[in-house]
C-alpha cells in the first residue's frame, strides 16, 4: 500500500445563525477525510452588530469596513487556536477555505450581487497560510445564483449508485442536494431552517436557540399562521433558487402575524399568538417546506435522506421528517463519516482544494451558471 503524503486543508464557515465559527481539517490525499473539527463562539458584540446590519440592510462605510476587519481577526484567532490545540504548524496546511460572513445575498436584482465580510488578506497575514475566499461571486459572474455551492461537495462524498440520495443541510436556511444516479445534480434552498426559530426564541426567551425543540414542543401549531407563512412566493419558485435572512427574519414574521390579525379584526374574530405556539408553527414551516420540496422528486430507486446542520439535533424537526417522508430512509451524515455540525465547513475545505488544483467546483444545474468554473480568489500568505 502506498503511503501518500497528507494534503491538509482547513475549512471555515460562519453561517446565517451567527452563533460562531466552524473549523475543520480535511485530508485530500485520497478520498476526502474529516480529521479534526471544532467550534468557536462569536463574540456577542460582533454578533449583535452583524445581526443589525443584516436585518436593517443599511450601514455606514466605516461600520462595514470595521466589521470586515473584526471578522478577519476572529477567523485568524480561530485558526491559530485550532492549530495550536491540535499541534499543527501553518506550513503543514495547504490552504484555508474561508466562506466569510454573508451579510447580503441578492442574486435576482437588476444588478445581482452577494456580499461576504472578512478580510481574507488579513486572515492570510495573521495565520501564515494562504487563503481561498470570495467563492460565490465567480459563479454569479457566470450567470449563477452564487448559491448553493455545497451540493458539488455533497456529490463528491455522498453520491451512491444504489440510492437516490438527498442531502439536507438544516442551518439558518435549509438547503437540499439531490444526488440521483444518471441525473444532473439539483440543489436549492427550501426555505428557513433554524433562523426564524433562533430569532424568535431569542426575542421571547433570551436564548440563542431552542435546544432539542423543547420550547416548541410546549406549543401548538397555528394552522392559519402556517398557511400564511407558506404563501410566501419564494416557496413556489422553481429551482435553482436561494434565499437568506434578508427575507426570512422577524420583520417578515411580524408582518405575517399582523396581516392575519388585521383580517381577523375585520371579522371580529380573536386569535391568540402565544410565543410557544408561534415557535411550534415555525418548526412546522421548516418541516413542511422541506417535505413539499422532496415530495416533488420522482425516482424508482430506494430513496435516502442524509440530514446535517444544527436542525439535525432538533428532535421535533427530525420527527416531522420521519413522519412525513415515509418512503425515505432518513438518517444523518454522521453515519457517512461527516459530523452533522461540520459538513458545510468541510465543503469549503474542498472548494479550496478545487481552487488550488484548478478544478471546476460549481454545478450549473444547481446554481444556473452558464458554465462550470473554478471558484474563489487566492490570497497568498506572503
UniProtKB/Swiss-Prot annotation:
SUPFAM superfamilies: Actin-like ATPase domain. It catalyses: 1,6-anhydro-N-acetyl-beta-muramate + ATP + H2O = N-acetyl-D-muramate 6-phosphate + ADP + H(+). It comes from the Bacteria. The keyword Transcription does not apply. Keywords: ATP-binding, Carbohydrate metabolism, Kinase, Nucleotide-binding, Transferase. Pfam families: AnmK (PF03702). Gene3D superfamilies: 3.30.420.40. Its EC number is 2.7.1.170. GO terms for molecular function: ATP binding; kinase activity; phosphotransferase activity, alcohol group as acceptor. Belongs to the anhydro-N-acetylmuramic acid kinase family. This is Anhydro-N-acetylmuramic acid kinase. It comes from Haemophilus influenzae (strain ATCC 51907 / DSM 11121 / KW20 / Rd). The lineage of its organism: Bacteria, Pseudomonadati, Pseudomonadota, Gammaproteobacteria, Pasteurellales.
Amino acid at each position: 500500500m502506498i503511503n501518500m503524503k497528507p494534503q491538509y486543508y482547513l475549512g471555515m464557515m460562519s453561517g446565517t445563525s451567527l452563533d460562531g465559527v466552524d473549523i475543520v481539517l480535511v485530508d485530500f490525499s485520497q478520498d476526502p477525510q474529516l480529521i479534526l473539527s471544532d467550534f468557536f463562539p462569536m463574540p456577542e458584540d460582533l454578533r449583535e452588530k452583524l445581526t443589525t446590519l443584516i436585518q436593517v440592510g443599511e450601514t455606514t462605510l466605516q461600520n462595514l469596513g470595521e466589521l470586515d476587519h473584526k471578522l478577519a481577526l476572529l477567523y485568524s484567532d480561530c485558526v491559530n487556536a485550532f492549530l495550536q490545540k491540535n499541534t499543527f504548524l501553518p506550513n503543514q496546511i495547504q490552504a484555508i477555505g474561508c466562506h466569510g460572513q454573508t451579510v447580503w445575498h441578492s442574486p435576482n436584482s437588476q444588478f445581482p450581487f452577494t456580499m461576504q465580510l472578512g478580510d481574507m488578506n488579513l486572515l492570510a497575514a495573521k495565520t501564515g497560510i494562504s487563503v481561498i475566499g470570495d467563492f460565490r461571486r465567480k459563479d454569479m459572474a457566470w450567470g449563477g445564483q452564487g448559491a448553493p455551492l455545497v451540493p458539488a461537495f455533497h456529490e463528491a462524498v455522498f453520491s451512491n449508485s444504489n440510492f437516490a440520495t438527498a442531502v439536507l443541510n438544516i442551518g439558518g436556511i435549509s438547503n437540499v442536494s439531490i444526488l440521483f444516479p444518471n441525473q444532473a445534480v439539483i440543489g436549492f434552498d427550501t426555505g428557513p431552517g433554524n433562523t426564524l426559530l433562533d430569532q424568535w426564541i431569542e426575542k421571547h426567551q433570551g436564548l440563542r436557540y431552542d435546544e432539542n425543540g423543547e420550547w416548541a414542543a410546549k406549543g401548538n401549531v397555528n394552522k392559519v399562521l402556517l398557511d400564511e407563512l407558506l404563501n410566501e412566493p419564494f416557496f413556489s419558485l422553481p429551482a435553482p433558487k436561494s434565499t437568506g435572512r434578508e427575507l426570512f427574519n422577524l420583520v417578515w414574521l411580524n408582518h405575517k402575524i399582523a396581516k392575519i390579525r388585521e383580517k381577523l379584526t375585520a371579522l371580529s374574530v380573536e386569535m391568540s399568538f402565544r410565543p410557544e405556539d408561534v415557535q411550534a408553527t415555525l418548526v412546522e414551516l421548516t418541516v413542511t417546506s422541506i417535505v413539499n420540496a422532496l415530495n416533488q422528486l420522482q425516482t424508482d430507486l430506494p430513496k435516502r435522506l442524509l440530514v446535517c446542520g444544527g436542525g439535525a439535533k432538533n428532535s421535533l424537526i427530525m420527527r416531522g421528517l420521519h413522519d412525513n417522508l415515509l418512503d425515505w430512509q432518513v438518517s444523518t451524515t454522521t453515519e457517512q463519516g461527516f459530523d452533522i455540525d461540520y459538513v458545510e465547513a468541510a465543503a469549503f475545505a474542498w472548494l479550496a482544494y478545487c481552487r488550488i488544483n484548478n478544478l471546476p467546483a460549481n454545478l450549473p444545474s444547481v446554481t444556473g451558471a452558464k458554465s462550470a468554473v473554478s471558484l474563489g480568489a487566492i490570497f497568498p500568505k506572503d
